């Protein structure tokens, strides 16, 4: 996978995480969900910074960052499930961010 493609995908994850964060702020959701979405958004921003400042050759570092991003997405999804009845817009936004991160992680692992 080309570095520029990874960067684009990370940007997409960040946009989805940003959407999820806005949806969470607009609705009334449990603190755990709010915190996990915030953490996922911060992780996406960190991944973006890593791409901007990092050397293109540092694949293992990039893989680690994407792995952490996907784990943050997992935690946000779990918090969504734990919250029970959540606004569908929040649920969909969290799901999209999680799916983007998972998909990127799988593609990076395949090479």
Where do the language-model regions lie?
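Amphipathic alpha-helical interaction modules
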Residues: 24-71
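Amphipathic alpha-helical binding modules
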Residues: 77-111
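Generic structural signal for well-ordered, non-transmembrane alpha-helical segments
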Residues: 4, 11-14, 18, 38-45, ...
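Short terminal alpha-helical segments
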Residues: 2-34
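Heptad-repeat alpha-helical rod positions in long coiled-coil/spectrin-like domains
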Residues: 15, 22-25, 49, 53, ...
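A generic structured-segment signal
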Residues: 23-27, 33-36, 79-83, 93-95
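Residue-level signal for short amphipathic helical patches enriched in basic/charged
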Residues: 1, 54-57, 111
């Amino acid at each position: 996978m080309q570095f520029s493609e990874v960067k684009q995908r990370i940007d997409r994850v960040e946009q989805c995480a940003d959407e999820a964060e806005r949806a969470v702020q607009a609705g009334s959701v449990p603190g755990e969900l709010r915190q996990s979405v915030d953490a996922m958004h911060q992780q996406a921003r960190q991944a973006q910074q890593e791409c901007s400042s990092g050397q293109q050759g540092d694949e293992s570092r990039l893989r680690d960052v994407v792995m952490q991003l996907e784990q943050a997405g997992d935690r946000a999804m779990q918090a969504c499930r734990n919250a029970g009845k959540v606004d569908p817009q929040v649920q969909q936004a969290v799901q999209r961010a999680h799916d983007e991160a998972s998909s990127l992680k799988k593609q990076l692992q395949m090479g």
